[in-house]
Amino acid sequence: NETAQNSLLKVIEEPPEYAFFILLCENRNKILPTILSRCASVLIPPLSNDEIFEIFGSKNEFLAAYSMGNPGKFLSLSEDGEFLTLREEFFNKIPMLIQKKRTSIYPLCEFFEKNKDEKDTLFEFLTLFFGDILLKKNFLEGRIINRDKTETIDRFNTETTKQSVVSSLEIIAKLQRELGKYGAYALCVNDMFIKLWEEING
């Protein structure tokens, strides 16, 4: 935050001779200009999947793609059993969106409500999943994140149009914006899944 950054300013302006300070950030736009002007920026490029596999001796294609070249994130997620369990539950529930009865989405709504504390992760799963369907429709399978879930992606690819997938991504993005304004999580989630079901099933 801004207060913490300002507290660093004097130390950075007059550092002790024996020390170097290395500041790490994921988004330089969140760093105050007064801090940036006193630092030398070094961009660390993301690692390739093969480089991550070589470092950790693990060939989890999904985690490598999901981590987007960040080895620390790859390591953290590979050791996070709750994250992996949540993802499996998500993929067990998401096919309910292509069932022909609208009431089939209620267990999916309940799953999102039950895991409200993990809503950021769940919405990332949802966005990436629909993004993968769009990549499939555009013949860009090499960029798919959920590479171990191709059967589910293929099912949705068959049941959707390109326009319905684009519209679904817009519905998800709008819901995330509204959550920040209104905060009625259960109502917003239910409304979102109803709209997604209608978009997919006509």
Question: Where do the language-model regions lie?
Answer:
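Conserved AAA+/SF3 P-loop NTPase catalytic/coupling segment centered on the Walker-B
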Residues: 1-9, 31-32
